């Protein structure tokens, strides 16, 4: 029997004291703050893990939103500078080229190994020519085409791109995808056919120019997918040389576009006025053409007051959508990107009805846009089902009929059976 004050009692009392001191430390303010910070860190880490797991879907949603904003602000920018469309396009291309140059310099300073990677520039020569045709036609067409009509006419790119990918890339499509393309086009055209109350400036000639721009754009999209899926793809060099060729080709297009004049002097005068007055319009908001002009006349009156602010916002949204486009192309396809962009048809209509977004380019919105939206979503779902069917058929063709282990076992059993039969026959005839 132990006495009081023995070593065991002392050790027990000391351990209980230690336990009490540990509990008191666990409830200290500093420990609570540490636990709170750890909890916040784990929550943020879990959120980032969830975002990373859903990154493709999030990028697709951002792509649609940015696509809507880019379309709206492009139309607003053209509306404010419609008398200087070709100079406006040159300013946009040159701005993006400067941004890519800055990115290239940073990559050269901090990631030289990436910049040393080989990249074939030759395909971009033809791509730049196609981009020049597409940009020039769409820019001149959009000058007198309403914002919503731009989006609806642009949906012809979906079947044209599918045809281009089939001819150039030999891509296979499921019949569901062809049906979905027809559904999307039907609901895209439903809006302008049934709703003729749009009072914005729409000229048939400009509508046709914008429609024709889809032909070179669809061919360029198919060739661009070939570039993106190449193992030698270099995103920085691709953007650098792409904008460079596009810029010089667009100068050629501008020179050809301003040719129909009576004299050489008039030709160079028109080029001078295009550049100087366009520069004043975009960067200083100066209206040059204010007399003998009107909405139904050629030229229209200048409206350059907010051109520079709209230009900055357009560059911001367009830069962001290019980044999202790269990520989607690396994990998807150009046809999926186009079909994803068709969701913007009703969403753009909503955006054009909101004055704080569309500004002077505001148009009316009605319930027909909801019908178009549901129809386009149905087409997208059918396209996704067709993509799944194609993927299942591809996996079925690529997978072996018999697993390696099973085939090896079957060969072994067959060989053993043949050996046993030969031994039996040998025993019978000897």
From Swiss-Prot:
<dbReference type="InterPro" id="IPR017258">
    <property type="entry name" value="Transprt_Chloroquine"/>
</dbReference>
<feature type="topological domain" description="Cytoplasmic">
    <location>
        <begin position="386"/>
        <end position="430"/>
    </location>
</feature>
<feature type="disulfide bond">
    <location>
        <begin position="281"/>
        <end position="304"/>
    </location>
</feature>
<feature type="topological domain" description="Vacuolar">
    <location>
        <begin position="261"/>
        <end position="306"/>
    </location>
</feature>
<keyword id="KW-0812">Transmembrane</keyword>
<comment type="function">
    <text>Nutrient transporter. Involved in maintaining the osmotic homeostasis of the digestive vacuole.</text>
</comment>
<feature type="topological domain" description="Cytoplasmic">
    <location>
        <begin position="110"/>
        <end position="122"/>
    </location>
</feature>
<feature type="compositionally biased region" description="Low complexity">
    <location>
        <begin position="7"/>
        <end position="21"/>
    </location>
</feature>
<keyword id="KW-1015">Disulfide bond</keyword>
<dbReference type="GO" id="GO:0042910">
    <property type="term" value="F:xenobiotic transmembrane transporter activity"/>
</dbReference>
<feature type="transmembrane region" description="Helical">
    <location>
        <begin position="174"/>
        <end position="194"/>
    </location>
</feature>
<feature type="transmembrane region" description="Helical">
    <location>
        <begin position="89"/>
        <end position="109"/>
    </location>
</feature>
<feature type="transmembrane region" description="Helical">
    <location>
        <begin position="240"/>
        <end position="260"/>
    </location>
</feature>
<feature type="topological domain" description="Cytoplasmic">
    <location>
        <begin position="330"/>
        <end position="335"/>
    </location>
</feature>
<keyword id="KW-0472">Membrane</keyword>
<feature type="glycosylation site" description="N-linked (GlcNAc...) asparagine">
    <location>
        <position position="195"/>
    </location>
</feature>
<dbReference type="Pfam" id="PF08627">
    <property type="entry name" value="CRT-like"/>
</dbReference>
<feature type="topological domain" description="Cytoplasmic">
    <location>
        <begin position="224"/>
        <end position="239"/>
    </location>
</feature>
<dbReference type="InterPro" id="IPR013936">
    <property type="entry name" value="CRT-like"/>
</dbReference>
<dbReference type="GO" id="GO:0005774">
    <property type="term" value="C:vacuolar membrane"/>
</dbReference>
<feature type="topological domain" description="Cytoplasmic">
    <location>
        <begin position="169"/>
        <end position="173"/>
    </location>
</feature>
<keyword id="KW-1133">Transmembrane helix</keyword>
<feature type="topological domain" description="Vacuolar">
    <location>
        <begin position="144"/>
        <end position="147"/>
    </location>
</feature>
<feature type="topological domain" description="Cytoplasmic">
    <location>
        <begin position="1"/>
        <end position="53"/>
    </location>
</feature>
<dbReference type="GO" id="GO:0006865">
    <property type="term" value="P:amino acid transport"/>
</dbReference>
<keyword id="KW-0926">Vacuole</keyword>
<feature type="topological domain" description="Vacuolar">
    <location>
        <begin position="195"/>
        <end position="206"/>
    </location>
</feature>
<feature type="topological domain" description="Vacuolar">
    <location>
        <begin position="359"/>
        <end position="364"/>
    </location>
</feature>
<feature type="transmembrane region" description="Helical">
    <location>
        <begin position="123"/>
        <end position="143"/>
    </location>
</feature>
<keyword id="KW-0813">Transport</keyword>
<keyword id="KW-0029">Amino-acid transport</keyword>
<protein>
    <recommendedName>
        <fullName>Putative chloroquine resistance transporter</fullName>
    </recommendedName>
</protein>
<comment type="similarity">
    <text>Belongs to the CRT-like transporter family.</text>
</comment>
<feature type="transmembrane region" description="Helical">
    <location>
        <begin position="307"/>
        <end position="329"/>
    </location>
</feature>
<feature type="disulfide bond">
    <location>
        <begin position="293"/>
        <end position="301"/>
    </location>
</feature>
<feature type="topological domain" description="Vacuolar">
    <location>
        <begin position="75"/>
        <end position="88"/>
    </location>
</feature>
<feature type="transmembrane region" description="Helical">
    <location>
        <begin position="54"/>
        <end position="74"/>
    </location>
</feature>
<feature type="transmembrane region" description="Helical">
    <location>
        <begin position="207"/>
        <end position="223"/>
    </location>
</feature>
<feature type="transmembrane region" description="Helical">
    <location>
        <begin position="365"/>
        <end position="385"/>
    </location>
</feature>
<feature type="transmembrane region" description="Helical">
    <location>
        <begin position="336"/>
        <end position="358"/>
    </location>
</feature>
<feature type="region of interest" description="Disordered">
    <location>
        <begin position="1"/>
        <end position="22"/>
    </location>
</feature>
<feature type="transmembrane region" description="Helical">
    <location>
        <begin position="148"/>
        <end position="168"/>
    </location>
</feature>
């Amino acid at each position: 029997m132990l006495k009081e004050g023995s070593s065991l009692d002392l050790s027990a009392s000391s351990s209980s004291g230690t336990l009490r001191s540990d509990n008191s430390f666990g409830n200290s303010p500093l420990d609570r703050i540490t636990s709170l910070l750890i909890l916040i860190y784990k929550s943020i880490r879990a959120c980032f893990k969830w975002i990373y797991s859903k990154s493709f879907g999030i990028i697709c949603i951002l792509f649609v939103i940015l696509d809507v904003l880019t379309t709206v602000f492009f139309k607003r920018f053209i509306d404010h500078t419609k008398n200087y469309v070709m100079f406006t396009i040159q300013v946009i291309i040159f701005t993006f080229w400067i941004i890519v140059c800055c990115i290239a310099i940073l990559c050269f300073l901090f990631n030289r190994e990436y910049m040393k990677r080989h990249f074939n520039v030759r395909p971009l020569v033809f791509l730049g020519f196609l981009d020049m045709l597409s940009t020039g036609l769409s820019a001149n067409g959009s000058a007198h085409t309403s914002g919503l009509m731009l989006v609806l006419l642009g949906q012809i790119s979906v079947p044209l791109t599918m045809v281009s990918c089939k001819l150039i890339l030999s891509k296979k499509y499921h019949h569901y995808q062809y049906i979905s393309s027809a559904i999307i086009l039907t609901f895209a055209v439903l809006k302008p056919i049934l709703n003729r109350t749009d009072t914005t400036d729409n000229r048939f000639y400009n509508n046709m120019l914008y429609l024709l721009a889809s032909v070179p754009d669809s061919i360029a999209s198919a060739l661009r997918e070939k570039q993106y899926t190449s193992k030698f793809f270099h995103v920085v060099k691709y953007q650098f040389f792409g904008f460079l060729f596009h810029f010089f080709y667009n100068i050629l297009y501008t020179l050809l576009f301003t040719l129909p004049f009576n004299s050489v002097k008039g030709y160079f005068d028109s080029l001078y006025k295009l550049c100087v007055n366009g520069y004043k319009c975009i960067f200083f908001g100066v209206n040059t053409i204010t007399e003998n002009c009107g909405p139904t006349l050629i030229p229209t009156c200048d409206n350059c007051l907010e051109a520079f602010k709209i230009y900055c916002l357009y560059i911001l949204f367009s830069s962001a959508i290019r980044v999202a486009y790269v990520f989607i192309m690396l994990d998807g396809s150009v046809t999926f990107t186009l079909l994803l962009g068709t969701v913007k048809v009703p969403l753009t209509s909503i955006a054009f009805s909101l004055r704080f977004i569309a500004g002077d380019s505001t148009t009316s919105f009605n319930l027909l846009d909801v019908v178009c939206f549901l129809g386009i979503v149905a087409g997208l779902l059918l396209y996704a089902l067709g993509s799944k069917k194609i993927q299942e058929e591809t996996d079925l063709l690529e997978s072996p009929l018999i697993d390696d282990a099973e085939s090896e076992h079957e060969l072994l059993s067959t060989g053993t059976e043949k050996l046993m039969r030969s031994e039996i026959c040998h025993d019978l005839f000897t």
